[in-house]
């Protein structure tokens, strides 16, 4: 008889077999044959391990519940290691050594034994009675907590106890000797020597293949196992880590009969959280991971909830996907090793002549690692799933592992997407989940992403950070609430967003949001026929997914902004990084918005009501106008500069005391020269190679903006009465067209910023970042947009794809023994090697490393066609903007304006600016109405 795991009590119940997916052709092969247990009573219940291996239950005479049986420890004083390998003879290291003796670096002194803390003795590992033996299937795995059949040794306690932490580590651990200097490979010479020793001392073992797949349970170091385990932890769940060498494509993961612990345990998953990373450092990983642990701990405190409670951690799975084994930061692997979800020496690059696509580690951990390297135990267990991709195939492929490989097995209710480095606040993940629970038609949601300004706002001294802080704040106050009212948010940021799994799932015919989302991954493959338009569109793949959810055929999903969910993120603090990031954002958003315009008719094939279909169509028209204004923003900004300054100096009163005409001529030519400098740099230079030139252009554009604001203020000042008698007739003031247009345009922008910020009780960015944003505004238009258009051919993320296979980990060779398929693998067997490497990883994290500048490698495939397309678009873009400038600055147009529009009250104000100002007023009024409606709806819980 085989068993499956009950959803309610997490206890194994007889059910005639596992509940395997319907596409598994032969579920009976997962059952445990009775022949395995020859020599034992057939009445003894047998419990399958999460790894799927055959187990030999310990004999017992005690009466047990036939529905659930947990093997009891024997009365012998032998350790788990002794039970597996036999009791070795005493050796010179019978009583062990202090960790400092194991990892002592150059110049470190040995602490006398009399001053050392008492350590538990452990047996010598100089001899193993069965080191040269092969492991038959009948010798494997007494119970999940004794799955030592993979060849590794059960570690024993050789370290001082660690602190108990609620969910944040504290710096209360006693200091250790400083390790030797960090090498260029991300570790000390001691760590690499220990790793080399561990690899060299591996022993060939024979492991049963599970449906042709290499899946094994690896014991974790004793320092990872807490003395007090969290509520609901199954026996053995924290004693071993599960490793699977996935040799298939993500779409074939379940079809290849791979499985996950949550599926085998029968746990229902409400939240499936993914953290994607490339080569980010350990500090960024810990910032995000510790924040997620805090959020999960908060869920366990909600004892009055129908969904959450003390054992809520069992309903949350945290998945970390690293994009490329050879590019991941070594210190990141050390962090995961300390948490028990990664181990050196067990990965294989080939299994039975098939290339490994991803290394999957599963472990339930209570270890918390601080950003300073301190290690402690949290009160809440965390179900961790670490997917280390063998090759660098970019972020979309990482999400394909998450959604298409793991999702069908875990079947979550809500999926949360995070980028490593994003820090959700204490209750943010719950706030996102509550939105889905409260509104059954919500298919996707996002929270507020704010710029990390540092302690006491110290990063705001950098004008670049301050400008982005203001931009982020106003987007969260005006844009996202406005779009949320309509139910279609143009972008759910991949750095912090959530999706209902049913909403993103494809239809039965394979079409749907996820199919459209992952189409972008295939476009950059060798031999792909995708156009440069499509490849630029998928630079903003999160916009594509958001649009596809809303227009899903015969469905009525909508998107919502959750103000209460907040997450902080680092923003670029240097000019090259800022320009490179915005190049991806602008190109992706422009082409994704164009795609949404072209496919807007799909709104009418969805399942939305007629009223929402009309409102979504109206939103599409609004987005079309915004796209048009963005396209002509270079010419519009220059014309505003030209006419405002020229009109202010043409009157009887010169704002520059008679030097206005000379100043205007100089800065007009400077402005035009700066545009051509930016154009030349954008066509031939990377921002990293032209840092000083771009910085100089930003400074000069800020000077031009300062002159523009001064002249605008001077013009308004000249139009208002200067005496108390003049203010008695206020109606005459509104008859002055110049005053009305300038005043309304200023109120529609800057006044709107202030009023809406006060309504949302967030006015502080107006004080700390508003001026910096105003001075950076011309650079947003003239530098970022021109650079983005000049680099349409570059559809890279700054990372280089890796399509080659590696053979540096060793392979698992297929052999047969007693008619069963086995894999010969080299595995660690020396306990002191595993413990010493764990200790050294723990020690090295306490030493900060110097950050290195990242080097970007541009994409070169299809370079000729891409650059030709780039040239044509740049000519069209600059040509249309120059045509507008030449038309409205020509003498013919100026004379026509003077003869038809100029009068005593309007000075020399240009009608083109009138159109621009009223358009800005109308669009701003719509945004304000949207943010106001969002507040009203929020008050009534909608």
Curated annotation (Swiss-Prot):
Q: Which GO terms describe its biological process?
A: cell wall organization; chitin biosynthetic process
Q: Which residues are glycosylated?
A: 23, 587, 736, 803
Q: Where in the cell is it found?
A: Cell membrane
Polar residues bias located where? Answer: 71-80
For membrane topology, the record states:
Multi-pass membrane protein
Q: What is its EC number?
A: 2.4.1.16
From which domain of life does this come?
Eukaryota
Q: Which UniProt keywords apply?
A: Cell membrane, Cell wall biogenesis/degradation, Glycoprotein, Glycosyltransferase, Membrane, Transferase, Transmembrane, Transmembrane helix
Question: Which conditions up-regulate this protein?
Answer: Induced by the antifungal agent caspofungin.
Q: Which residue ranges are recorded for the region named Disordered?
A: 1-132
Taking the first listed entry, what is the main subcellular location of this protein, grouped into a coarse class? membrane
One GO MF term on file is:
chitin synthase activity
Provide ranges: composition bias, Low complexity. 18-33
Mutant phenotype after disruption: Abnormal capsular morphology: abnormal fiber distribution, decreases capsular diameter. Decreases extracellular vesicle secretion.
Please tell me one Gene Ontology term that the record gives under cellular component: cell septum
Locate the compositionally biased regions of type Basic and acidic residues. Answer: 1-13
Q: Which InterPro entries does this entry report, sorted A to Z?
A: Chitin_synth, Chitin_synth_fun, Chitin_synth_N, Nucleotide-diphossugar_trans
Membrane-crossing segments per the record: 590-610, 625-645, 663-683, 696-716, 739-759, 770-790, 873-893, 916-936
Which reactions does this protein catalyse?
A: [(1->4)-N-acetyl-beta-D-glucosaminyl](n) + UDP-N-acetyl-alpha-D-glucosamine = [(1->4)-N-acetyl-beta-D-glucosaminyl](n+1) + UDP + H(+)
Q: Which CDD domains match?
A: Chitin_synth_C
Q: What class of enzyme is it?
A: transferase
Keyword Cell division applies: no
What does the UniProt record say this protein does?
Polymerizes chitin, a structural polymer of the cell wall and septum, by transferring the sugar moiety of UDP-GlcNAc to the non-reducing end of the growing chitin polymer.
PANTHER family hit by this protein: CHITIN SYNTHASE, CHITIN SYNTHASE 2
Q: Which family does it belong to?
A: Belongs to the chitin synthase family. Class III subfamily.
From the Swiss-Prot or TrEMBL record, give the protein name: Chitin synthase 2
